[in-house]
């Protein structure tokens, strides 16, 4: 996860990769989503998600299907449907 804080707005970009083996294919799923939100009381994006106001979220994913016997691939780009509606919870909160 990469988080950047600028002038009261926090931008967070997260990546997840999952590999699944099917009968004929090996699927590699890559999901990327980004959050932009504001924190009203803290300057380092460390507030719990209940204190944040979400401004924007977007995501995309890539599914690849590799068929070993033919050495061919299939690429599909889609809008991710499993995006969180709020920033992920902070591992700690500054006092």
UniProtKB/Swiss-Prot annotation:
It comes from the Eukaryota. This is Putative per-hexamer repeat protein 4. The gene is Phxr4.
